[in-house]
């Protein structure tokens, strides 16, 4: 840190981002290079630079810890105390990761396409790598370090659905080898209706089966699930001897909602009700996981046995997210991670203020939206 500066004057946007059964991650930025100490319980780590990501491991499940970032006052996003998640019962059987809304080919960020844009609209700096390449490179690096059994990319692989953009996605994510599985999103079916048409399909892992649905209605942003796919899902879930988790690009409509709009931004009401019916009848299904909305959110529908109905924030801008899943004999834990390479954090610090400053709270979600443990 420069002489004459105080840490308390230069720390910004400190967030307790990830809370697991045995680890936490705190992120923040400083004005210029600074050395900052973060304390969790009796552990402390000092980090240096402008963008800081502090990971503390070796914590005990369901235990309260004190948290302190020297020079930062406690806030709603940086509480002075927190409690770690419960650990699912039984042995850990598998680990997998997901990403969504990676948007290869996108060149501007923050545009709604309405007559009156809220702004700001952001671009990569001239001569710099495109921000989708920067963000996805960071995600891939961190996922490779996790060494998961599988990676599911839940759609919006591209910006406009061109062959060149799709190839850029494949070139990047091929680093993950045969562990990588992907399904299209609405952006991928705007030009061609044949890109990434792989679903429905299953991915068999130790202790769990992943079922992937194609929720795209080509040419439009809202989604559907065909009756053929729902019949397939019910058949494979009914026959499964293992718990099952279901993935698609679009999120379901809430069957308890009084507003029934056939152009709902996610899966249309009729198909959402049918999907919830399958979840209700098939007790092997332990959750549904989507992207599309660019936010972290977890809902529970009585019409779907109150299993988690999950949306995960996008890779391409704030907060720059990917999700880790730890599968145990007795359940699973979801941990949403912030992509923390310096280049990625530099971009997401710019984009957190999009849409007239409203984007941070929308995209980030609560701690419970990002990290939770669910029993089978």
Ranges and model annotations:
Residues 36, 329-376:
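A short C-terminal boundary segment appended to hydrolase-like catalytic domains
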Residues 1-87:
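Beta-strand-enriched, solvent-exposed domains that form extended recognition/catalytic surfaces
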Residues 104-108, 159-164, 187-192, 218-221, ...:
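Active-site environment of divalent metal-dependent phosphoester hydrolases
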Residues 18-23, 64-71, 75-162:
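N-terminal active-site segment of His-dependent metallophosphoesterases
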Residues 139-150, 211, 220-308, 358-376:
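His/acidic metal-ligating clusters that form di-metal
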Residues 70-76, 80-88, 163-238, 266-278, ...:
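Extended active-site neighborhood of metal-dependent phosphoesterases/phosphodiesterases
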Residues 93-106, 208-217, 245-247, 306-313, ...:
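Active-site-proximal beta-strand elements of phosphoester/diester hydrolases
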Residues 100-134, 190-196, 218-225, 259-264, ...:
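Acidic/histidine-rich helix-loop elements
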